[in-house]
């Protein structure tokens, strides 16, 4: 995995190791390089704004489980609990 992707993944999900590393290491390497390096370096959004957008979209599409999973990652990138509450209230 590319170092940038590895560092970004670790900041988002500290200590998390995907089961795909064992079952399909080629797939997870390609996916991680795409998701955690190419995508995040493709636009002009700062990380905090990106995570605010991700949280709002997940609520908007009723992706509640995914939303819960991304809360800690968003916090790791600077989204505050007050901002998280605001996102939730705006999506109601």
Locate predicted features.
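A cross-kingdom feature marking solvent-exposed beta-strand/loop segments within repeated
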Residues: 68-90
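Compositionally biased, intrinsically disordered low-complexity segments
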Residues: 43, 90-91
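Generic structural signal for hydrophobic core residues of well-folded globular domains
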Residues: 34, 56-62, 91-92
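Short, structured motif recognition centered on aromatic/hydrophobic residues
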Residues: 49-58, 87-88
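Acidic, glycine/proline-rich low-complexity segments that act as flexible tails and inter-domain linkers
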Residues: 1-48, 61, 68, 72-76
């Amino acid at each position: 995995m590319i170092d940038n992707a590895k560092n970004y993944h670790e900041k988002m999900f500290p200590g998390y190791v995907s089961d795909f590393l064992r079952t399909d290491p080629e797939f997870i390497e390609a996916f991680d390089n795409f998701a955690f390096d190419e995508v995040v370096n493709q636009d002009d959004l700062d990380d905090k704004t990106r995570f605010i957008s991700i949280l709002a979209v997940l609520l908007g599409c009723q992706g509640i489980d995914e939303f819960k999973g991304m809360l800690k990652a968003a916090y790791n990138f600077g989204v505050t609990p007050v901002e998280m509450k605001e996102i939730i209230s705006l999506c109601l």
